[in-house]
Amino acid sequence: MAVETLSPDWEFDRVDDGSQKIHAEVQLKNYGKFLEEYTSQLRRIEDALDDSIGDVWDFNLDPIALKLLPYEQSSLLELIKTENKVLNKVITVYAALCCEIKKLKYEAETKFYNGLLFYGEGATDASMVEGDCQIQMGRFISFLQELSCFVTRCYEVVMNVVHQLAALYISNKIAPKIIETTGVHFQTMYEHLGELLTVLLTLDEIIDNHITLKDHWTMYKRLLKSVHHNPSKFGIQEEKLKPFEKFLLKLEGQLLDGMIFQACIEQQFDSLNGGVSVSKNSTFAEEFAHSIRSIFANVEAKLGEPSEIDQRDKYVGICGLFVLHFQIFRTIDKKFYKSLLDICKKVPAITLTANIIWFPDNFLIQKIPAAAKLLDRKSLQAIKIHRDTFLQQKAQSLTKDVQSYYVFVSSWMMKMESILSKEQRMDKFAEDLTNRCNVFIQGFLYAYSISTIIKTTMNLYMSMQKPMTKTSVKALCRLVELLKAIEHMFYRRSMVVADSVSHITQHLQHQALHSISVAKKRVISDKKYSEQRLDVLSALVLAENTLNGPSTKQRRLIVSLALSVGTQMKTFKDEELFPLQVVMKKLDLISELRERVQTQCDCCFLYWHRAVFPIYLDDVYENAVDAARLHYMFSALRDCVPAMMHARHLESYEILLDCYDKEIMEILNEHLLDKLCKEIEKDLRLSVHTHLKLDDRNPFKVGMKDLALFFSLNPIRFFNRFIDIRAYVTHYLDKTFYNLTTVALHDWATYSEMRNLATQRYGLVMTEAHLPSQTLEQGLDVLEIMRNIHIFVSRYLYNLNNQIFIERTSNNKHLNTINIRHIANSIRTHGTGIMNTTVNFTYQFLKKKFYIFSQFMYDEHIKSRLIKDIRFFREIKDQNDHKYPFDRAEKFNRGIRKLGVTPEGQSYLDQFRQLISQIGNAMGYVRMIRSGGLHCSSNAIRFVPDLEDIVNFEELVKEEGLAEETLKAARHLDSVLSDHTRNSAEGTEYFKMLVDVFAPEFRRPKNIHLRNFYIIVPPLTLNFVEHSISCKEKLNKKNKIGAAFTDDGFAMGVAYILKLLDQYREFDSLHWFQSVREKYLKEIRAVAKQQNVQSASQDEKLLQTMNLTQKRLDVYLQEFELLYFSLSSARIFFRADKTAAEENQEKKEKEEETKTSNGDLSDSTVSADPVVK
């Protein structure tokens, strides 16, 4: 009742159709607006959370994969539903067979091709041990068994396809037809059958080209033979061996003899038990031939053209089908056979997979020798000659091709960016989708063309064993980069492409549905009934229903099969049919866009041509301008990995991957990274040492590479890691600079400068070495001096006042100096323990020197002379005002030369002076060590606010009840602080130690001969002054050999030895320096007096001589004065104010005081005890 009452009120809706449509559009627009606003809101949230989130995907980081390929949930029986049951069955059977073929093809391409191709890889000849070949083959048998089962299944499918097609096209006039087949051509079925034949043919080619596989197989058979002779030795039962050998023979016959394809086409297609007749079925033979021609016509038109998609693969299928047709029906179309061979002029070779290249002419001649005889030899020979010329032409045009494709691909990328960035307008939505569809397909076509050029050229070179020029290699590598650039482009814009693809497929489906509905209306409008018309209508309805849904492979296959039936009886006009076919092709491409692009851009074949990689890297290094292309090449090299995972001849495919990884990384290191490291290091070194003018670095003459571009590269992804060129070079430089600085610490400043330069010039963030540095004036290290103290004291001169050592002579431009800061830095480097070690070394050195000193003093000539001098002085001292006569010292100095001189002209006294200087230098070094130690300690302690009141950190930590680790740290800090405080406050009395250790020995009665030392000091000083003046004169004359301006080691040595012998008073009693002063002053006065006399007589020559004499006397007096001051200063270090007896007395008094204070302390403790109790 309710319906009846309502219906009149709703009657007006029939008229109001237009308004309802407008209303729906408004709602749709509002919904669209809402979605847009919501999207932009989400985008704003994303931007606020993270800058890196965006529409552009990074090829190196793909944690999320976006798969666009729709997955069919319904079964074929559910999809193929029409009222026409017979048609349903036909389409279902054919669709099921096509799906089966696709699955077999996929399994072959992923599992079996790769398993066979990679057999024997991953082990070099050097690493192969005897027996490895047999072990590999042993592991591989199970794979061959699986391949055998696969091939058998392929044979069954081929047989079934032929039977199903033969059953439909019956030549028997009496037998009932399943459906009317006039004008029905299931071209799709033949294409799929061709694909399956291609798989079998490819397996044959792979095995035929695989020498390693065949060799290992032969070795394995030999192994079995030897096992067969003595099975018990190998622990194998004999009854198990025979079936295994039979099985191997079966495998060999089926797979390894190159008969996989041949055995398939030689099957018995005619059913023996009166089933389907094939070879006698003329209708089927005609249909078969017609379909081959139709496919060929389509293929021939596109082959070698820019719009080529998969025509090459189809051509291989056509050749397979042609051979199968000949095998079954034994008829041959000579004209068509010639047409097939003519294609070889366009396409001389086809890559089946990886590095397997196939020559159609060889195949057709070999498989149909009867037809080959009909052709003249010349034309067959011409094909082979053409192949050579094709390769030559290709090599010449490669560079040109690269340039062209560079422009094409670049402009295509710009189109992609612009079309995908442009906002879609609703009023031009369809047009926009068409544009996008065309740009996507154009990208795929470029990928196909480039991929074909690379594979064909590289594999032809390899197959014909012709050498490639470097130019060709570089050009091909550039094409590989372009190929990966196309793939990257699609990947980068994955989000937008995914969005567009779904819209484009819907748009194309809509176009196809429109064409089909027009044809369907035409069929329905024709009122004549026939079964054929019913089939056509059912097929069109099926196509319509299937198109109404996702564009899956199964649905597109069903539409294709349905249209094979639906296009008969001129249901479509010619101008309608072609656009429909174009739309269906586009739908195929767009629906599988991602997969097809991936397949075309897959560079797995590079594994077999990896010999080009070193040449490529050399080119990248030489032309650093576009270093970023490395990303593309590594992306291409990475493509081999999925294929390698199907290797079955090793314990695990990981071994093969590791081997490949190692090989590529070694090549990369050798041809790029190591060269780059060396070049950068060289550049930094030369830049830092420009003042040395080592070589011409004028960029206009030598040329210049901007290697900094390598460091702006993002890390390159390879396997499961990133190769960071910047990090690699930085690490190399850090390691090199660190190691070289540890070897020569004084070079730290140079390496520090090089680090700064690396940061400025190349942007490398270097790590500080944190090695204890030295001062900028690069001096010797304490450790070095300590180990070579005997060399040091002879090569360096000491300056007492400035406390500095200066190198005596050097071949360098500058002389080395060593001062307190050097020593302090060295002590900081090695720790304060080095100070005591140094003093110990000095003690060892002094011991040796004092032994020589003693020998000299003991010498008869010297000793007798010295005793004479002592006696003489005692006799004349009262007359001579207690002064040692200058003449006596001069006489000694001259007289000693009579004892002999060295080849260098040195007397014994000169050598003795040098010995004392060396002893003094050693003592000067000890003094410097002590000063350096204090300097180092005070530097370390300078941040402690009050040395008198240092906080005890351990106690503070205990009070706060902090963790054990903190307590330990506080204890360490306290210990360090107390050490530093003690070191800076005290400083060890090394001089006192060195006096105390030698003095007792020197003062013993057995060394009485040393007591004469004080009397040799006057002639020694005289000798020293003469030597010193001579050195300074050389300095004035710029004669660097023997030049010097200081040698306070002598004064230091004299002061030290006098202290050891306790002879300060004896030496002072000589009043030697007073005697010298008097002598020179007297002479100066005499000269001055003479000058006054001579100035009246105006004898210029005589005046000049007198001036020179006066100057000489002044210089000598000045030198003696300097020596006197130095000796007085040196004596202070050894407490010259006290004699040995006075020092001993002082020592005793101190000891007694200590004992007394200790005694008082013990008494007070005893008296305190009772109180405590």
Swiss-Prot record:
Keyword Protein transport in record: yes
Coiled coil: 1135-1161
Keywords: Acetylation, Coiled coil, Disease variant, Endosome, Intellectual disability, Phosphoprotein, Protein transport, Transport
Composition skew (Basic and acidic residues), residue ranges: 1142-1155
Positions carrying Phosphoserine: 7
Residues with the N-acetylalanine modification: 2
GO annotation terms (biological process): cognition; endolysosomal toll-like receptor signaling pathway; endosomal transport; endosome organization; neuromuscular process; nuclear envelope budding; protein transport; regulation of Arp2/3 complex-mediated actin nucleation
Segments of skewed composition (Polar residues): 1157-1167
Keyword Transcription regulation: no
One Pfam family per UniProt: WASH-7_C
GO cellular component, one term: WASH complex
Signal peptide: none
Phosphothreonine modifications at: 1154
Segments for region (Sufficient for interaction with WASHC5): 705-1173
Subcellular location: Early endosome
Cited InterPro entries: WASH-4_N, WASH-7_C, WASH-7_central, WASH7
Subunit structure: Component of the WASH core complex also described as WASH regulatory complex (SHRC) composed of WASH (WASHC1, WASH2P or WASH3P), WASHC2 (WASHC2A or WASHC2C), WASHC3, WASHC4 and WASHC5. The WASH core complex associates via WASHC2 with the F-actin-capping protein dimer (formed by CAPZA1, CAPZA2 or CAPZA3 and CAPZB) in a transient or substoichiometric manner which was initially described as WASH complex.
Disorder association: Intellectual developmental disorder, autosomal recessive 43: A disorder characterized by significantly below average general intellectual functioning associated with impairments in adaptive behavior and manifested during the developmental period.
General function of this protein: Acts as a component of the WASH core complex that functions as a nucleation-promoting factor (NPF) at the surface of endosomes, where it recruits and activates the Arp2/3 complex to induce actin polymerization, playing a key role in the fission of tubules that serve as transport intermediates during endosome sorting.
PANTHER family: WASH COMPLEX SUBUNIT 4 (PTHR31409:SF0)
Family: Belongs to the SWIP family.
Protein name: WASH complex subunit 4
Protein species of origin: Homo sapiens (Human)
